[in-house]
């Protein structure tokens, strides 16, 4: 058992349990299990980065840095940055390798949100590459013949849950706007590794074994992950020639080679012919897909502006609400070992999640009180609810200012992710924060052309109404499902000072908010902040990270009136601080690293 808050937390996190999946209740299913899995022959730079993570200290650099979820992907991005590429160039290289070595988490068959700081203009831009509901999606897509919601995994596994992928279009759009390196060269490491093979890490092997029954339902998926009927084992060398060929098409034809032609036809055929659970995605859906530029959402916290992705992401708004409520309290004076600090953090999160469940969805379809939700007077009003000594006995959505009727029912949609986060700073001063996903671990379990297809449509509410009142996050054709992904860039005096984000389903919001508090209020460096044991409260139950000193808060939080549950809380935080150089932190619960020069 890990008993000390610092510095042994990192070493403790490296010994967390093998991958598990938790109970399947609304927003309750954990993402991927923790592992420090080594991947294959490691360079001196990777060994040094892994040692820094294990020692609980940041990786430091002067010129550029990349932090992501797998050393092979980080190395691919580092090569691009070292050769003079931008953060956008490096992101493409990182993503296409992640889609190979971490296929359960993200890839070409999924979607992503990207936050970009442009050093030349001083401007923040956010790009929405979220998956989209097909034109044939009906309001009852995830309901049975009696109008009742399907069981969650009955909806997830197969074609019904597949939305139009956005990641390839986002890669191309980011490169078009901000890239300098030749597009084809960004795929070289991904193609080489797919052709020559990579060593299956302990984490990937454990996740395959845990999900073997679902992976076995579809022949193409089974032949890749369960060769000869047995799950891939740690240490096996795995090639993916189909993925290599897909990358060659993207390298030569761009995203058009994905959204049209043979790859698009294969995607549609795979989805619509999925045995037992066919979907409704069409070639027209693929052909019409577009990346959408949206206004960044920025909320004030202390001397910082915490900026991220707006709707359909709920991440920046909910993180902003949590921090905006807590801006009314002196957390720095309380410190990380104060139960009172965690009471405030937990109940601020509950208030923010109440607003999230009522108001947040795709704002192209649903009028939203976006600015009202993060307006300081409104958040001060919400903060006043925390003045009593104990946990809130009741939590309800607030009434943010808005010039439109707000008659929405509360949503209990499930968000069960397999996700990854990338943070990059380049030599030109540009900063990228991108969270990328296929939703659940292994997505829909459907595989084509060497990559898995998402199950993103299950992020919609399965119900359309509650007690006759419409639910904002209900499914509609062309709509993008609400997400908790929270790619974040923290600004101070008009300049970026921190890039951060994480996987983790709806707990992403708590992971990111906690890490920003640890860094901004408690004086932790980025490695300490991302490694800090998790305490997360969304709907009333306080989850504390099992096997860490966070469990020591259980009795104190219980005395304050919280129900407490010790469980695995497997984030995948990757952060870069931009202050007196570059300082990178990588979550010890996963196998990622930070590299820089």
Predicted stretch roles:
Residues 18-22:
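Sec/Tat signal peptide C-region and signal peptidase I cleavage site
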Residues 478-480, 512, 521-568:
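Extended C-terminal subregions enriched in glycine
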Residues 100-104, 111-126, 277-282, 430-498, ...:
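Active-site rim segments in enzyme catalytic domains, especially the processed small/beta chain
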Residues 293, 416-419, 483-485:
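Short, small/polar residue-rich loop motifs at catalytic or cofactor-binding pockets
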Residues 9-17:
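Bacterial N-terminal signal peptides
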Residues 1-9:
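Bacterial N-terminal signal peptides that target proteins for export
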Residues 43, 328-437, 587:
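Internal maturation/activation junctions in enzymes
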Residues 24-75, 79, 87-253, 258-260, ...:
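Noncatalytic scaffold domains of N-terminal-nucleophile
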């Amino acid at each position: 058992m890990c008993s000390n808050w610092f510095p042994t937390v990192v070493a403790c996190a490296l010994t967390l349990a093998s991958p598990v999946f938790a109970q399947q209740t609304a927003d309750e299913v954990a993402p991927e299990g923790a592992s420090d899995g080594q991947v294959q022959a490691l360079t001196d730079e990777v060994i040094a980065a892994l040692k820094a993570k294990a020692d609980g200290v940041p990786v430091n650099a002067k010129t550029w840095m990349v932090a992501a979820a797998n050393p092979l992907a980080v190395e691919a991005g580092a090569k691009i940055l070292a050769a003079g590429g931008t953060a956008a160039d490096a992101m493409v290289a990182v993503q296409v390798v992640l889609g190979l070595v971490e296929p359960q988490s993200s890839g070409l068959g999924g979607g992503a949100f990207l936050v970009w700081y442009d050093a030349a203009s001083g401007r923040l831009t956010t790009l929405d590459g979220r998956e989209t509901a097909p034109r044939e999606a009906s309001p009852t897509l995830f309901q049975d013949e009696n109008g009742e919601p399907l069981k969650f995994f009955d909806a997830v596994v197969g074609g019904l849950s597949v939305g139009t992928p956005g990641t390839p279009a986002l890669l191309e759009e980011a490169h078009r706007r901000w890239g300098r390196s030749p597009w084809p060269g960004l795929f070289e490491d991904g193609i080489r590794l797919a052709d020559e093979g990579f060593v299956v890490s302990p984490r990937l092997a454990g996740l395959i074994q845990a999900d073997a029954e679902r992976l076995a339902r579809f022949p193409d998926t089974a032949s890749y992950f369960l060769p000869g009927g047995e799950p891939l084992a740690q240490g096996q060398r795995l090639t993916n020639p189909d993925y290599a060929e897909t990358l060659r098409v993207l390298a030569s034809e761009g995203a058009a080679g994905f959204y049209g032609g043979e790859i698009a036809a294969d995607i549609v055929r795979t989805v619509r012919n999925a045995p037992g659970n066919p979907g409704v995605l069409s070639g027209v859906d693929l052909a019409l897909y577009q990346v959408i530029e949206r206004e960044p959402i920025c909320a004030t916290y202390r001397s910082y502006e915490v900026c991220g992705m707006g709707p359909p992401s709920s991440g920046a708004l909910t993180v902003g609400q949590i921090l905006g409520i807590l801006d009314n309290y002196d957390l720095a004076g309380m410190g990380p070992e104060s139960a009172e600090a965690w009471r405030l953090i937990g109940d601020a999160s509950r208030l923010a999640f109440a607003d999230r469940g009522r108001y947040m969805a795709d704002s192209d379809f649903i009028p939203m009180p976006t600015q009202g939700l993060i307006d300081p007077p409104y958040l001060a009003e919400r903060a006043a609810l925390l003045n009593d000594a104990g946990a809130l006995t009741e939590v309800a959505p607030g009434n943010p200012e808005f010039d439109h009727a707000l008659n929405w029912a509360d949503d209990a949609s499930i968000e069960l992710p397999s996700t990854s986060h990338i943070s990059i700073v380049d030599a030109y001063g540009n900063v990228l924060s991108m969270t990328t996903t296929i939703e659940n671990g292994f997505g829909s379990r459907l595989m084509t052309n060497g990559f898995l297809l998402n199950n993103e449509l299950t992020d919609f509410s399965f119900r359309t109404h509650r007690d006759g009142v419409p639910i904002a996050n209900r499914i509609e054709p062309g709509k993008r499902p609400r997400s908790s992904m929270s790619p974040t860039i923290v600004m101070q005096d008009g300049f970026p000072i921190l890039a951060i984000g994480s996987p983790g389903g709806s707990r992403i919001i708590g992971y990111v908010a906690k890490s920003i508090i640890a860094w901004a209020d408690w004086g932790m460096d980025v490695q300490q902040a991302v490694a800090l044991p998790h305490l997360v409260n969304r709907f009333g139950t306080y989850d504390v990270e099992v096997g860490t000193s966070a469990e020591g808060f259980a009795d104190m939080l219980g005395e304050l009136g919280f129900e407490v549950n010790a469980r695995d809380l497997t984030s995948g935080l990757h952060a870069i601080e931009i202050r007196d150089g570059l300082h990178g932190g990588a979550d010890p619960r996963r196998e990622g690293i930070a590299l820089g020069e």
